[in-house]
Amino acid sequence: FHCMTIDVPMFLDGEIKYVKFFEDDGIALREYFDFPVLGRVLLYPYPHPEQVTIPRHISCRQVTNKGSVLPERYYNLIRDMCRLGLAGLEPVNVKGTEVVPQDFSSAFIIRERDRILRETDFGDQRGCVSVVVRGKKGGQFREYRFHMASRSQALGEGTGIPAAIGAILLLEDKVEGTGVMPPEACINPGYLIELVSQVMPIDEKKEDGKSFGGIIVEEVDEKGEIKKLEI
């Protein structure tokens, strides 16, 4: 609910702007994206630090963050309850009983989750984190996509493995600067990619055989043709 009710920062046209999830400026940022493992998913504007920190360290015109929760029916339930005003914190009187709308909504959503997972035959957790970089190279349009996909976890591996790699780089004295910094300010991405090949063999030892999918890199040319790159 928090992500849908606060003003969402986005770096648009070279400056920080704040959009609202349910209003025209937020709706305009919704888009479908084809993920490895997940397939086509409708994404929504999502508040995150990258929109604020990346433009401070990398010259660019636009930085957005978008996301969703699977299965989509589950996310749609959360979205619709928030849109109906059931995310409020002020108690309301329901037949003589004081009820906090958000407390009711949270309990209802948790109750419905198992039913939705069962009816959609969702199966194991899965997830993907993707970074898309667009611009011009040699005067021609280029798009690069970096994906971290998992068939056995949601955001666990997409969050945990990069953080673990960051800790390794810190121990190896490959983190530049001091203090609190975002990754783009202190880590050479090449170091991270080098370590992925060391992490993946360890992850392959999972008993269920569903290992971390590693980093997938794709290039999209001016014709929209997608080519997978070896790293």
Could you describe each region identified by the protein language model?
Residues F1-I231:
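C-terminal catalytic/substrate-binding lobe primarily of soluble NAD(P)-dependent oxidoreductases
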